[in-house]
Amino acid sequence: MGLSRSTEPKRFEAIPIAPASSDSSPPPMSSAIPAGFPLEPQALRAAYPHSAAGTIDPAIARRVANVLCIHLVLVVITQKFALPISGEIQIAFAMLLQYAVFGIFVLMGVLRVHLVRALMVLAFVSFAMIVHAVYNADVGYSPGSLFLLTLILTMYAFVVPMDEQNYNRILRTFQLIAVVASALVFVNWGTQVAGLGMFNLEDFIPDKFQYINYVYMNKLVWNQPWFKPNGIVFLEVSHLSQFIGMALVIELARFRRLKYAALYAVALLSSFGGTGTLLVLASAPFLLVMLPRKYIAAVVLAAPLLLVVAAQIGVLDNFTKRATEFGTEKSSGYNRFVLPAVTSANALERDGLGGLLGSGAGSIPAGDPTKGGVNGFAWSPYAKVIYEYGLIGFLLWLPLTLYAIFNRGIPFI
């Protein structure tokens, strides 16, 4: 989980880049911060002949990190924008920026194809194309959706070199963006308390360029004037809370600056976003193993204060009410966590080959399939894959996703 603190040139280290989906809800950002094993000198020389054996040129890593830091900022501030393709099929600006970055890395001479990842992508795409050509050809499917998924998965196959010092620079850039996001949470509340309402970025984006199927303006309580903070540029409060939640996990695991951790914690509670809180809670067992005792003691001492603050501003009451949503159909909690699992289970039980091969790209309704679907719904990626590509497609997609994000021993990011 950790890396040494030395600033000397290191052997390659691995951190993942997880692309965001623009045809379904983006997968939540991982809270893991894995480090890779060193690349053998022979393999390093083969990949980068100009590098010293066993090390990466710091100048190369610095240039790569510069591009990735700028890219990270641009992806965050443009996530509400998308390029319309056909119907509800869109390509997020984030994806366009990612491929632009790939082009820059090609020109820099640092982009490489990771063989194992590439073969796993090829296996899924080949399966999908054969099934759509033979099995789903008559029932119809969305070529645009299939093409979009191919673009998304292909991003997993590309890697670039990195060392520890510049890896830290990328993480620090993420943390600084999270500071701004946390400040925007308080700005959102401040303008509402002042009677100015909450700034709505969608008022300034042409409809056809808005990234659809996200609840950007989300009421805190139905029929009440208050809106949950959206951080202005974030897709919705869940994305904002996940971003801040991951910053809190990174801060505790990596940098351990208590003032930053406190800022993220208060902002996370003030966002009223449940998914970011769940992300932190899911990471807690791993953090307890990593953190020195004095930090654990600080967390234990701060917990009662945070609970009091949470109770005073209504967070605990809100979370209690949200907890009941899991059993209430059409509620946010049900749609986000329960409905995808139920829909996936029903899809696997379809007659004939439907459970194994799926019903075709783009076929999942924008809502509960048993109730005709509803407009404005973004599915969890796993449910979309199971429904449209079947059990076999899911068994090809899941290892690829887990390997690309969580595996160790890759000498690149």
Regions found by a protein language model. Give the residues of each.
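A membrane-periplasm/extracellular boundary helix in multi-pass inner-membrane enzymes
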Residues: A183-Q192, L288-T328, A347-R350
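N-terminal hydrophobic segments of proteins, predominantly signal-anchor/transmembrane helices
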Residues: N66-F81, Q98-A157
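Alpha-helical transmembrane segments of multi-pass inner-membrane proteins
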Residues: R172-L196, N218-F272, L278-V289
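Transmembrane alpha-helical segments and their membrane-water interfaces
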Residues: G103-G109, N136-V193, W397-T401
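Long extracytoplasmic/lumenal interhelical loops at the membrane interface
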Residues: K80-G87, D317-Y389
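Loop-to-helix entry and N-terminal half of a specific, functionally important transmembrane alpha helix
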Residues: V67-I77, L301-L305, A404-I413
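Membrane-interface helix-loop-helix junctions at transmembrane boundaries of multi-pass membrane enzymes
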Residues: I56-R62, V106-L119, E251-A262, R293-Y295, ...
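Hydrophobic transmembrane alpha-helices and their immediate junctions
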Residues: S283-L287, K294-A298, E388-I413
